[in-house]
Amino acid sequence: MIRTHEAGTLRPADAGSRVVLAGWVARRRDLGGVVFLDLRDASGIVQVVAREGVAGQVASRVRAEFCLRVAGEVRLRPAGNENPELETGDVEVVADEIEVLSEAAPLPFPVTGPVEVNEETRLKYRYLDLRRPGPARALRLRSEMNRLAREVMARHRFVEVETPYLTRSTPEGARDFLVPARLQPGHWYALPQSPQLFKQLLMVAGLERYYQLARCFRDEDFRADRQPEFTQLDIEMSFVTEDDVMALAEDVIATLWSQLAGVELALPLPRLTYAEAMRRFGSDKPDLRFGQEIVDLTKFFAGTSLRIFQAPYVGAVVMPGGAGQSRSELDEWTTFARSRGAKGLAYVLVGAELTGPIAKNLSDAERAGLPAATGARPGDAIFFAAGEQRASQELLGAVRLEIARRCRLTDPASGAPAWSLCWIVDPPLFEPDGAGGWTSVHHPFTAPKPEWMDRFADKPGEALAAAYDIVANGNEIGGGSIRIHRADVQQRVFEVLGISEAEANAKFGFLLEAFRYGPPPHGGIAFGWDRIAALLAGVESIRDVIAFPKTASGTDPLTGAPTPITPEQRKEAGIDADPYAAAGRPPGRQSA
């Protein structure tokens, strides 16, 4: 073996022992006649002391991130020289042998201390970035997440199954990544956006309880904090209700939070209906760590003469202390609203009397009653949105979050809880597609709520889904549903969606065929594993918990991907081949 001990494991009990270590030079200090090295490996750091002699000569020429093998004796540090910041701070290794295993070129950025370099450079040298404590810690936390999830699944007698990465293209809302099939020129595989159809087939197969840590791929425009390839903990169960799936999901989440965040979640988690979440928070993934709930003022302004409030819906949200904002700060709110598609953002400032651009246009009764109607106090600001209900609620939801950011309402120092998790249940089954028809809010195999099972086609806009999302601190971390297993219900859903029988067979024929053979009632959930890891690691971006992530533009600075292919590769892959000419048949349904 190259080493006998790991650097970060040495303790006072090891004093007097001879050890052989291997690792990297995190820090070097030459005090003339004696050289101190901080030697780092995956377990931690220990101080190495090299005095005159061969070891000292070698130590005097090493530099940051040289890879070394060190042999010597563990000794207690002299009294007063202990380092409480290191777990090994009570001991040091007095080296009598130092071997340079490999040298390191000058670093593009330091791997100790703060890093002032752009993200693209960090990703280009990701292998160096991962030597830093934070990124390395995040990957180890993620590994623990995987272990704990598997323990929970095993306890509930689930079977871990790997589903295909090379499959056929099926519509799931985003574009597929396509892979040419060389042996069938002109034909293409698709990388799966999720294992949705395969896990339902496993339920038809009688497996009953399935899970996997599934890699998923979506070729979508990059926005917010997305990656083209991501991981989810994917779960499917037979003979279950919504409550059954949610109880299992809570076991997974409670285990993760207990073991990795030291937080015991109170179960069962609170549940809000989709309608309630939108009404109170303007979001289907509300952050419940703070208040500032939306106030519905539609009835309050029912007889108003103010034209902007003569709308189907009027709502407001209060900013504590907002009346003290400068004019430029108040103008920023208009810019904020316009960036979200609104014309602006009306407001009043609460003091001895109401002030602001619209205050003078309110009636005496409206001015007198508005503070009580909204719960605003002197010194607060009240922001309004009016118009179509959902759009107005979403704008106020965004304003609410911005208020929290500016007022630091989610800061534990302000009294906010560190964590707030909840379920959002009973979402719409369908939503308008913008062309006079309907589209599935989730996917076309989502079951209606039992009370809507026989009448969803009559009022698609009111029908509710047997679906559920789990939210943590305003982040959706998982979602699922009960699936349709009855052929007649599935056919009626397709009819609402405007999907003909021929189109359904072309897109989902293999699944519909399987459903002819006694499919069980089933449902499931998928957790956004990257997002959960980011939350538990306390980092802002999921890129910080992925070993080799892509940039916001979808590129990989480390490998240079994506890259062009050669003409020879293009020809060999059959990218330009006509599949119908090759098969000797006219255009139509392609073989699966």
UniProtKB/Swiss-Prot annotation:
Binding site for L-aspartate: 172, 218, 442, 483
EC number(s) stated in the UniProt entry for this protein: 6.1.1.23
Disulphide bridges: none
Residue span of region Aspartate: 196-199
Listed InterPro entries: Aa-tRNA-synt_II (IPR004364), aa-tRNA-synth_II (IPR006195), aa-tRNA-synth_II/BPL/LPL (IPR045864), Asp-tRNA-ligase_1 (IPR004524), Asp-tRNA-ligase_1_N (IPR047089), Asp/Asn-tRNA-synth_IIb (IPR002312), AspRS_core (IPR047090), GAD-like_sf (IPR004115)
SUPFAM superfamilies for this protein: Class II aaRS and biotin synthetases, GAD domain-like, Nucleic acid-binding proteins
UniProtKB keywords: Aminoacyl-tRNA synthetase, ATP-binding, Cytoplasm, Ligase, Nucleotide-binding, Protein biosynthesis
Region feature Disordered, mapped onto this chain: 553-592
Annotated positions binding ATP: 218-220, 227, 476, 528-531
Gene3D superfamilies reported for this sequence: Bira Bifunctional Protein, Domain 2 (3.30.930.10), GAD-like domain (3.30.1360.30), Nucleic acid-binding proteins (2.40.50.140)
Pfam families per record: GAD, tRNA-synt_2, tRNA_anti-codon
GO cellular component: cytoplasm
Cellular location(s): Cytoplasm
Family annotation (PANTHER family): ASPARTATE--TRNA LIGASE, MITOCHONDRIAL (PTHR22594:SF5), ASPARTYL/LYSYL-TRNA SYNTHETASE (PTHR22594)
Family classification: Belongs to the class-II aminoacyl-tRNA synthetase family. Type 1 subfamily.
HAMAP family, A to Z: Asp_tRNA_synth_type1 (MF_00044)
Function text: Aspartyl-tRNA synthetase with relaxed tRNA specificity since it is able to aspartylate not only its cognate tRNA(Asp) but also tRNA(Asn). Reaction proceeds in two steps: L-aspartate is first activated by ATP to form Asp-AMP and then transferred to the acceptor end of tRNA(Asp/Asn).
Protein name stated in the entry: Aspartate--tRNA(Asp/Asn) ligase
Gene behind this protein: aspS
